[in-house]
Amino acid sequence: MTYSKIQNILPGLGLSVAITAAAMVLEKIEEHYAGRAWLEALVIAILLGTAVRSLARPGPRFNKGINFSAKLLLEIAVALLGASISASAVIEAGSGLIFGIAAVVAVAITLSYGIGRLLKLPHRMAVLVACGNSICGNSAIAAMAPVIGAESEDVAASIAFTAILGVIVVLTLPLLVPLLGLSFTQYGILAGLTVYAVPQVLAATAPVSLLSVQLGTLVKLVRVLMLGPVILVFALISGNKNADVKPGFFQLVPWFIIGFLAMMALHSLHLIPEAILPAIQYASMLLTIISMAALGLGVDIRSVASAGGRVTLTAILSLIALCCISLGLIHMLGVA
């Protein structure tokens, strides 16, 4: 990275770090006066970032640093998280859960597409919303768009809902733990099956427990890996008219997933010294909080209106359906 590029990202990165520091201080104040942190620093960072964006929108010079913090730092955090998980955890998950995840994705795409069509969304828009909701948000939308020949307006409108709904899910999903009496294991699986993006799983599960973080990330990674087969199916359905435009390998398998798996393999093979594991876990957590601050800075609440009522309603109903399907899978598998 050149000196000029570093200069370009410093304002946005600095603002994200400042919000992170404020969030961590507020968390400590909570702990001091309330006995515990009812809102974790991760959540506070999102709320503060969104408030800053809404009340005093940062100028263009902050954009590159905000994007850098929200994307690359969060991807690094996910990759580092692999160091806290061993391959035995994947084996213990069992084939039933893996096949169940695939089934949830398939059913969710079908239901979401049906909801979109019932609400009179165009075919391509309905496909984009369905894949974004059921697999991995913006990444799935971006990967699917060239396969089905979606227009840029369709992509922009489909992506608009993920910013707001993604944050809402991260903030509200932990409330289901006491409401539904979910165990840490059940909640981790639920988060992995419903949260849009891999990094957001960290934010949705960290306030609950480390076990929820680990299980949620594993489940979400399996869910993301469904993107390849789903794109292949839609490519076959769409025919040859879009065959000249194919998503690249890193759209189907993002680099941070490979990094996560590599770190997990190193941990499983005992190639990472136990003494540095706490430092790696802390670095992952800190980068995640910084990224959540940046995510909040990138959320424009007014984007929901620009996306259109039908798209928003489709996304909300699809998300509710996905939650119900996921809870059904957890019940069927007898997860305690």
Swiss-Prot record:
Question: Where is this chain primarily localised?
Answer: membrane
Q: How does it sit in the membrane?
A: Multi-pass membrane protein
Query: TM spans, by residue?
Result: 9-26, 36-55, 68-90, 94-116, 128-150, 160-182, 189-211, 221-240, 247-269, 279-301, 313-335
Pfam name, any one: Cons_hypoth698
Q: Where in the cell is it found?
A: Cell membrane
- Keyword line: Cell membrane, Membrane, Transmembrane, Transmembrane helix
Return the InterPro entries for the record: UPF0324_pro
Superkingdom classification of source: Bacteria
**Cellular component GO terms held in the UniProt record:** plasma membrane
Membership in a protein family: Belongs to the UPF0324 family.
Per its record, how is this protein called by name? Answer: UPF0324 membrane protein BR0028/BS1330_I0028
Give the originating organism. Answer: Brucella suis biovar 1 (strain 1330)
Upper classification of the source organism reads: Bacteria, Pseudomonadati, Pseudomonadota, Alphaproteobacteria, Hyphomicrobiales
